[in-house]
């Protein structure tokens, strides 16, 4: 087990360094096999995209509860819409019980689902449920989709380098089945701390 989270720098690949691909692949493989995740740096994504999303998310979470509940998640097995405090407890995944996670969530899936039976037929739920968008802030949708697009491209890049290591058993990804959450954790005093994307 790693004693610290690895930081993997993609800048040499982006700059075209021919020797960097295998080095990055090895670092990604090591992170996947030891800790299970890593911090990726040097990815070239404009930090303004994340800053604009964070600002829009904080404004959304600051709205009164009644306004957020207009787009409340319709069913517990569906990661779409607003999920208020008290509905999720991470420890339940391991069969335990505890007080609910002290967070609120806004969740979406892909916004460009093809109009084909695989995506629209009876077996498509909940993976392809429609997104629920708030009326305000007006830019939340565009900010989330811009961020999604950049993260999806980055994920394809990372996934491609991990495939260079045959010892890793890489599962085929279906990008249409991904979900994307904005979460805000609060202190016990109920003031908003920060948004996690």
Where are these regions (language model features)?
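Peripheral, non-catalytic segments flanking oxidoreductase cores
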Residues: 1-197
